[in-house]
Amino acid sequence: MDIKGKTIVITGGGQGLGRAMAVYLAGSGACLALIDLNAEKLAETAGLCRAAGGSAHTYLANVAREEEVVATFERIVADTGAVHGLINNAGILRDGLMLKARDGKIEKRLSLAEWQAVIDVNLTGVFLCGREAATKMIEQGNPGVIINISSVSRAGNMGQTNYSAAKAGVAAMAVTWAKELARYGIRAAAIAPGFIATDMVASMKPEALEKMTAGIPLRRMGTPEEIAHTARFIFENDYITGRVIETDGGIRL
């Protein structure tokens, strides 16, 4: 798919990886539909997209709420005319060990609220946005592409029961959708980033960063632009579907 002039929806598009992917795709002439909960960050990203050569529309919505997702995709089609691509990027963290004990006594447990908050956004939100994007593509007879942002944590990571479960789920959904939606000309895939040099990571202590990168064969963290490049590759390569691309510097080798 040539993304020039195509409408690409990005959830969590206000900052971080979402912003990087939006600006990168805008540089290829895409029309971005950015969904986030932070109006100020959305406006900043939209300005960067326009400066990069693309166009951008912004939408305030909680991806975990069905009625908001349905209404937002209706607005996107009304504003841009179509939905050609979706990057399911929105996500949150509520890290913590499932339980912590000392001398046979439980001191702390991961709460149901901490579990559910992550599942609602990182898994249910991906389902809702994927469903609505596919609905619009099929209704308009447009082929399209859905990309779910997973993580190397989908294989299981200490302190991330909720996050790992959600990221494994969105990878499985990408494979499932690739099988279900191919008949409509819709491709689906996932990206599993490793350690990426976002603003949050950059604020870590040098010794923590050194320890983090020591286990990566390429001996460095990835950049947000490298994840964005992977997304563009999936959009533009019409023979890619149902695959999870690990952009992780080899950490899972």
Where are these regions (language model features)?
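Conserved mid-core segment of classical short-chain dehydrogenase/reductases
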Residues: 93-116, 139, 159-162, 202-204
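Canonical Rossmann dinucleotide-binding motif of NAD(H)/NADP(H)-dependent dehydrogenases/reductases
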Residues: 3-32
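A short, exposed helix-loop element centered on a Lys and neighboring polar residues
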Residues: 130-131, 175
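C-terminal substrate-recognition "lid" of short-chain dehydrogenase/reductases
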Residues: 220-247, 252
